[in-house]
Regions:
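Extended amphipathic alpha-helical repeat scaffolds
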Residues: 1-11, 168
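Structural detector for internal amphipathic alpha-helices that build alpha-solenoid repeat scaffolds
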Residues: 8, 15-26, 42-63, 73, ...
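Amphipathic alpha-helical scaffolding segments comprising HEAT/armadillo-like alpha-solenoid repeats
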Residues: 25-38, 61-77, 95-111, 134-146, ...
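Glycine/proline-rich active-site loop of Rossmann-fold NAD(P)-dependent oxidoreductases
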Residues: 80
Length: 174
C-alpha cells in the first residue's frame, strides 16, 4: 500500500471508502493483508479499524469467501482492537470452514478486554459455533462447556441445548 493510498483511506469518509471497495473488493483484501503485516502504529491500527468497519458495513464477508482467511489471521493477531467485531462477523457467517478459528478466538486472552466482565467475544463465538450447527462445532462447544470460566461454560451449554448439530461438516480452512 502506497503512502497515497494510506492517505486516501485515512482522509476519506466511510461512505466513499465503502463505495470504492465495493467496486474493488480484492483491493480491500490486498490492503488488509499488507497492513496486517506492517509494524503496528497508531496509523495501522486506525486503518485496520476502518477496514473491519467496512467489512461489517459492506457485508463483504457474505459476498466473498476470500475474506475468511484474512479474518482468521486477524482474529489471531493481538496488535489491534477489532476482535469483538471479528467475532460478530464470525457469528453472522457461521461457516464450518472457520470452526477452529472461532474456537481459538473464544479462548484467546486479550489484555485490552480485561474489563469485559461478560466475555462478549466468547459469547459471540459460541453463538457462531451454535449457528454453524455441525458435529465439529458441537465438539468445540463441548470443550468450551468444560472451560474454567463460568460464563464461557454457560454460553457453550446454552448453544449445545439450542441446536441439534446435524448439519454437514465441510473441510476446515485453518
Amino acid at each position: 500500500m502506497t503512502k497515497e493510498e494510506k492517505k486516501f483511506i485515512l482522509s476519506s469518509n466511510h461512505g466513499e471508502l465503502k463505495e470504492y471497495f465495493l467496486k474493488n473488493p480484492r483491493k480491500l483484501l490486498k490492503f488488509l493483508e499488507e497492513i496486517r503485516l506492517e509494524n503496528i502504529s497508531e496509523e495501522t491500527v486506525d486503518i485496520i479499524h476502518i477496514f473491519i468497519f467496512l467489512i461489517v458495513a459492506g457485508e463483504f464477508y457474505l459476498k466473498n469467501d476470500n475474506f475468511n482467511e484474512i479474518l482468521c489471521k486477524l482474529s489471531k493477531d493481538k496488535n489491534h482492537y477489532e476482535h469483538e467485531n471479528i467475532a460478530l462477523i464470525f457469528e453472522n457467517l457461521h461457516s464450518p470452514k472457520l470452526i477452529n478459528c472461532v474456537y481459538n478466538l473464544t479462548i484467546m486472552e486479550l489484555d485490552y478486554m480485561e474489563y469485559d466482565e461478560f466475555f462478549n467475544i466468547a459469547r459471540k463465538c459460541t453463538y457462531a459455533l451454535g449457528y454453524t450447527n455441525t458435529p465439529k462445532a458441537k465438539e468445540k462447544l463441548e470443550l468450551l462447556a468444560k472451560n474454567e470460566n463460568e460464563l464461557i461454560r454457560e454460553y457453550a451449554i446454552k448453544q449445545l441445548n439450542r441446536h441439534d448439530f446435524t448439519d454437514k461438516d465441510v473441510e476446515e480452512q485453518d
